């Protein structure tokens, strides 16, 4: 899937001068594939986060890990999926803070921008979901500083070289995902990237008691899964 599907799309996009982004391979545990390797085959690896999962799980950590391990400057995320009209800008900021802490530096807003009616509110949503980020929201006219702040955060997050303490090998047992019950206990105050066999073979080397990547990143420790 990583090479023949996403790799083929990447090649075709490059041949035509197109930037390729994809939520490779998505969140579903039924997809038997390597998400880190699949995300490495796109220009901008993308995950997603929802308000119902405020700690930033889903696959945004996989997206930032793929960006770090494979030397990509942008780790993208579908942001605020299914945010409700009851969510305030303060709620959205908290969600964005989690995403930035997980290494995301581009927010692709999940919204319902298409609002053809002038006399209907809340207007066009989507498939029974709120998708509240549109001009019919009561705080919309006051939100410009918030979006400018998010743009500035994303810009600053792309500068410099990420400093990550640990790298965690996800193994090869399906599903190859960042699953909390499989992860070792990460000490408080330390951050990690996840990687899989492809990166171990093609991207990593050992020198001076550290694990190095070609893009000048390094890790102080490699952690293996419990299984």
Summary of predicted features, one role per range:
Residues 1-227:
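Carbohydrate-binding surfaces of carbohydrate-active enzymes
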